[in-house]
Structure formats: structure tokens, C-alpha cells
Amino acid sequence: MSYADFLDYWIDTYASFNLHYSTTVSYINIIKNHVKPRIGFYKLFQLDTRLLQEFINKIYVEYSFSKNYMASILKVVKGSLKYACYTLNYINSNPAEHVHAPRIDKINNDPAHIFTQEEIERILDRFKGTHSIYYSFLTAYYTGMRVSEVYGLTWDCIDFENKTLTINKNIIKKNQYGLPKRRNITKGHSVGVWYYGDCKNPQSRRKISIGDTLIKALKEYKKEQEENKKFYGDSYLYYYEKKVLNDITKKEETKLIEAKGELEVALPKAELVFVKDNGQFLGTDSPKYAFKVIHYELGINSRFHDFRDTHATRLIENGADIKAVSQRLGHSTIQTTYNIYVRVTNKMETETVNRFEEYTNSLDLPKTEDKPYLT
């Protein structure tokens, strides 16, 4: 069996059942773009540690991927061959067991961009006429939610009276077989079906507090949405929740069914928060064009996830408790919050110096004596 064929088998029999959907999708992309083209043609028994280490080294040198992405490539190789060796006994030993990513110091190529307040104002001003974008960006900035969590929000998740927001699902796009979304070349956009997905980890299922600014904005948006339903009438798009069985995992999932006008069906209605004026739901595809505008028109090179980075960083630099921030973001550990989302800003650096200056103010420094040959 070739390694390429085995990787397909590993995805179908192991990854799809044991890993989070987004992780499986990222592994499929790694396999397609990097593993199969370079070493997929080898038979399983032909793979050895030297070959795999050279593969990893070349990937690193050619692309200079981040530490996290290199770790993901290694997880694919190590995980798949561990499965082949210890679970299936297809090979006698795991040749990837002692393969490591190159330990070379490199310039930080983290793409994160921490928005300034002026940039946030410019972005919101640019999209004030596109309400689904404006309010979803505002929500992301004020909550630090993941993009799939923001667009997976339904109105029942928002408690206006108690000023809380419940995050209990996300939104993902699949094809009819429950596999990653595909690209429609003729129409130029990804084609698929929207599903509710599980949260990234148990800590990601959370209830967070939100302030008056966001509460007021979402109330206004909800009112506008109700007016849009009346304006579009039978042309307004509604979505319904249908329970289906995943053909691969055999697990029950919730699929969103689109319909023009309200239907008299025994399916619960999906009261999605961020939809176009006519009710159309674009999910996580919604902000893709917007960020091209932000980059090329506003000159801000950023991505949706930077709202999350900014939210965490601004909270920390303004003295918020790190544990509270970690829980708010839905991280599995506090260390994740430190390592990934909290950056040292100029303000934090200045405050650090000032604190030490305050601490040493009482220190009576003796004056240095003049050198005899300088007098």
C-alpha cells in the first residue's frame, strides 16, 4: 500500500472519528498540499526516519512555515504512521517516532495584527452600510469570539436582559458527504452546506458577559432584521435545522436547510444573527471579501482572527485577570492565552519600565567620584 492511499484510509477511519472537524480539514489540506506530492508515492515499508526527517527539513527551508504549522505537519506524519504501526500492525516500527522539526531560531512570522482604536473606527465606518458585516465585526471585537462562533450565533444565545452571550456551537461548511467544502470553479466561490458544529473544546462552551455598547448595537440590529423580514416578505430567506446522520462518522448532526419564505414544517427555525438584508446566510464566507477591502482599500493587512487577538491583548494590557480572559476566550488552559493571544504592546512595555522606576524611586543613588585625572 502506498503512503498516499494509507493517508486516505487514516483520515476516513481515524481522523474523522477522533479529531475535531476543523482539525481534520486542516490535516486533509496538509496531506494534499505537502505530504502526498513529496512522499505519498512511497510504499509504507519504504518510509524510514532519514527520509521523513529530510522531508520535514525541506518543507521548513522552502516555506519557512510557523512553528505551529510545522507541528501540524509532523502530527499528520507521526499520527498516521503510529496508527499504521501500533493499531494496524502494517509496519514493524514507527519511522516517524524520532523525527523532529528543525530547531532554528527564526524571525517571528506571526501574521497577527493588533488593531488600533483608529483602525477599528475606520473599518466599522467603511462597512456601516453592510449591516451583517458591521455588526459581526463589532461582536468579534467586543467579545473575542472565533469566526465560526460569531457566525454560528443564533438570537436565542443573546440574553439582552442579563447582558450575556452563550457560545454553545459553531458553524462549519461541508459537502453532502460530510467532507471539507469544495471550490466551484465556474462560480468562483466555495460550494457546500452549512452545519452546526461542536465547540473546539469543552471550555469553548461558555457564557460571557457583554457591555452596554454591544447590547445596544445588537438590539438595533435585531430590530432592523425584523423590518427586513416584513420588507422582503415571501422572498426573505429562512433557515431550518434538520437532524441528519453523517455518512462517515455515523453521528447525528444538524444541517441548515434554506427556504424562501416561511415554511409550515416540523423543523425548528434557525434564528441566525448575521445574515444579509434578504436573510441569506453566508456563514464564515461573509467576511472574506470584506478583508480584501480592508487590506487593499484601507491599507490594513489583517484577518478576522485579529479581532480575537486584539480583544485579548487589550484586556491584558488594561489589567484584566489572565484567568478571566482565558475563560472568556474559551481556551483549554491559561498558558494558551499567554502563548498565542497576548502580545507585548508598546503600552505594556512602557508600563513595565514605569513600574520599575516607581519601585526604585526611594533608592538613594550615591554620586560617582570624580577621577583624579579628569579634574
Label the predicted regions.
Residues 45, 91-93, 103-125, 174-191, ...:
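DNA breakage-rejoining catalytic core of tyrosine-based enzymes
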Residues 4, 11-83, 109, 280-286, ...:
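N-terminal core-binding DNA-recognition domain of tyrosine site-specific recombinases/integrases
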Residues 1-45, 50, 226-269:
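N-terminal DNA-binding module of tyrosine recombinases/phage integrases
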Residues 105-107, 114, 171, 329-354:
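Catalytic-site neighborhood detector that most strongly recognizes the C-terminal catalytic loop/helix
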Residues 82-95, 120, 140-180:
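Short, charged phosphate-coordinating catalytic segments
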Residues 157-164, 300-301, 320-342:
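Short, polar N-cap/turn motifs at the start of nucleic acid-interacting alpha helices
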Residues 162, 169-205, 214, 227-228, ...:
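C-terminal secondary-structure termini that scaffold catalytic or DNA-interacting sites
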Residues 63, 125, 129-133, 143, ...:
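Short, basic (Lys/Arg/His-rich) helix/loop patches that form interaction surfaces
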